[in-house]
């Protein structure tokens, strides 16, 4: 017999880059520009390596050309799979790793510098609260940082519980690492699903864990330094077409997201543009909200009318629209 359809009793939020942008974090379109600025400021070889990559992968473009972010990540990821080590290939094989590290540094430093009021913000508090479920594609630590600041009990992954916030990160995080990528001597890391922001946090075994969380949140003053010292490569799934290989180590996050969306009576999509080529997210959202005889009510928060059209095309025709951008207040 098939399993019974679960009751829709949860409030879920799907957060995209527009949510983080409300805190002045960089969105997807400006990431490469920000990486160039970081590299120039610190005289990093990454600046030259990126320009070499643009010339190699986009030979017809001008010297000032900076590619579209998703396309560039797709090219680099494909190169890692098929071109690495081939004679005459691109001369900086570690570029994707270096790029992830630079982005992690930018996001860590900017979250750390965010000034949170003692009482928080009403609009953010409606999202980051006990009993809610957050599903996000964002790599940054803003949700976790705010939850810690407001002492909101939180767990990464999905378990139905009114006593804590569930946060499901579909693209990984700046503070996650494959265990095999941990540096020798690394010690400050825990299981992803370990409960956070509680008086008594019980340590969970990590023997069978493929991905772990570096304890950057517990050390915000040196969050980036801790990540750099603990992993050779943060587990951040790049924005590219065909993410299935990178998704596999965090498959429980994806299955958990489906379970959570299947339980959602209301799904608020905040700051996510649902690009047509993001097939995995489209399929996940559609499957989750449509499961069972009573679909979830979808509400879209985005100033761009084309986003609302895509949600109605790909996710739910009856989705409600809020055209005001998300703001912290």
Residue positions per predicted region:
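Conserved catalytic-core helix/loop/strand module for nucleotide-ribose chemistry
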Residues: 2-266, 272-329
